[in-house]
Amino acid sequence: MPSKPSCSRTASALVLAASLQMTTPAVADDAMPRLGVSPVRDVIQAMTLEEKVALVLGQGMAGMSGGMQGPVVGGDANSRVPGAAGTTFPIARLGIPSIVLADGPAGLRITPTRDDAPNQTFHATAFPIASLLASSWDDALVERVGEAMGAEAAAYGVDVFLTPALNLHRYPLGSRNFEYYSEDPLVSGKMAAAMIRGIQSQDVGTSAKHYAANNHEWNRNTINVKVSERALRELYLKGFEIAVKESSPWTIMTSYNRINGTYTSESPWLLQDVLRDEWGFEGVVMTDWFAGADAVKQMQAGNDLLMPGTQSQQQALLNAARKGQLDVQVLDRNIERILDLIMRTRTFRHEPVSNKPDLDAHARISRQAATEGMVLLKNEHDALPLAAGKKLALFGNSAHDIIIGGTGSGDVHEAYSVTLLQGLEHAGYATDKALSQAYAQHIKTEKARRPETNPFLAPPPLPELLPTVEQIDAAATANDVALITIGRNSGEFIDRKAEGDFYLTEAEQTLIRSVSAAFHKAGKPVVVVLNIGGVIEVASWRDQVDAILLAWQPGQEAGHAMADVLSSKVNPSGKLTDTFALDLKDYPAAENFPGVTLLGPDPAASGGIVINDRAAEVEYRDDIRVGYRHFNTRGVEVAYPFGYGLSYTRFEYGDMKLTREDAGFTASIIVTNTGRRAGREVVQLYVSAPKSNLEKPAAELRAYARTRLLQPGQSQKLVMRVEPRGLMSFDPAVHRWVANPGRYTVSIGASSRDIRHQAHFDIKDELSFMP
């Protein structure tokens, strides 16, 4: 999303903006058409060419620079909502206001202080990251989070929230995976649709992004993704299709990358043929900030709004229009969609801006959401939940310096955050004061040593404190349970690394080994809490500990939410929306991630940030074999499979009832809580297709459902519907979605590898659907 503004203001941008204004009549004429009063086409007809070009460019924050594209045209985002990403261009004489656009995926990203209000703060709620929200498998919960996010945007005068992000988790080292939902397109699309519905219920627009196949950061502005049409349609576009059809986002944001040689923002096939003609999208398409290479091609392809609008783009469009190389009707078409967007906004309706969102209420929603998406990966010897009154020894930097979310445009300026230490103490647990004081001093010292970095980048991790043998032995004697946290963070521009990120550092391995040995010698359990934004390796160390809680990056209420789950105030019910492999090399994308440079040395070898200046390419040789579609089809052993998650109680699945309807089917099943604690269960439905000329995964997720909170002994009937399209694969040879004749297997289970019931049905004649 928007790159960090340059530090210096660009005088030429202000001069150009001023000259543009001079080409516009200075005083509104009563005879002039006005937006919202006159027909939109009359308003467009009254615009000068310069105004038309200005309107399709948008505006950025003053002083922002786009590198080779030059400085932006200007804008009032900082004066309207400081820290917002940009605005559209206003034309006062025609009644056209500028509207405000702001990040981000886990909460509103704006500046918390303002020069004109020194005694007031403008914080936003930091909600859990998307990967955690998806792990709840709860569309209604995600919609409530969206409602809260939309309410904050409305309170601060933001018209379009630049979220949700729904690219697939193709590979664990993608540094923005925390912004995205899953390795599966159905989960991604359903979660994104829920988020969109929630935000837009507050009369605030959304921008589903990054369309499409934007799966890593390395060379993101130039990378060419070589991918089959089948993989595109079944995986990388499918989530967007679901979101568009189920929630009608006001805008779509194109990605930086190219697909099969064409920038996404310059692709008529992506923007017109697929998005508009096939899916029926009626909103605005905008670029990511400074994306693409040719403004004229972007306009012609149907990328309506170029953000944040640069001088070079402005000049290119003006020249092309004057020379007849850009049909003005193309501009008019794109402008009409932009004006339709503007008329939907609160700004256009002159809605008041309170600057007073209900942060307390939203913090409660954030806390609840965080608890629902945490995943219990391991729990031996009833190590969890923690009994009341237990004394706890907290090891690990992030237990005391919590990681609530990722960096870059996904960051949020929250009013506070709660550490695990604070959350457990608030929940009534005693903690080892000497140990926590040692960590506090270590963190303070290491932060003072750390050089100041670009705030848009993830800071380098602090070296992990390794307590002495004496300190660990003393803790094992004085405390009842050891809690070890493992923390990870990432964000824009730099993808994750294998060593010391996907794999534990040597210090972390030593910490787990030493603490486990001491506490187990004393007959006491060891619990690991994963405070991470993406998948890591667990197989090499999990046998040393008794329990593992995947807490993700849980937002500002992190410590309270973690304590809620560890104490059983909330029974964990989250399940994985990604596969945890045994090793990084087990992912098929490991073969050539992140890609290769086509000219010059490979900058990835030095860990450099490469944004604009190198041609690069990556071939998606894994094709449709992403995530569990690979692991389960090839029979690859994994650490934890897709859909997996434990509970403090047990659930029994009754017999499945399958009913065929209109070429699709409905499956129902009764789930009963047979344990001793109240809890929720997530049930997943997979479909296996017969062999055909196309390679097929062993099974694919086609539906899911989540029970309400079931008390011990209570049951609930869950019903899941699969439409005919859910049985089909895309056959590029005939350019159709096809369900071949033969026997189909429907599997219902607690994970992709914990199938409880199966049923079969036959299709006699081929079913097909033309895009």
What are these regions (language model features)?
Residues 2-12:
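Bacterial N-terminal signal peptides that target proteins for export
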Residues 7, 20-22, 26:
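Extended, solvent-exposed functional surface patches
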Residues 11-21:
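Bacterial N-terminal signal peptides
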Residues 732-734:
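Short beta-alpha junctions and helix-cap segments that line functional grooves
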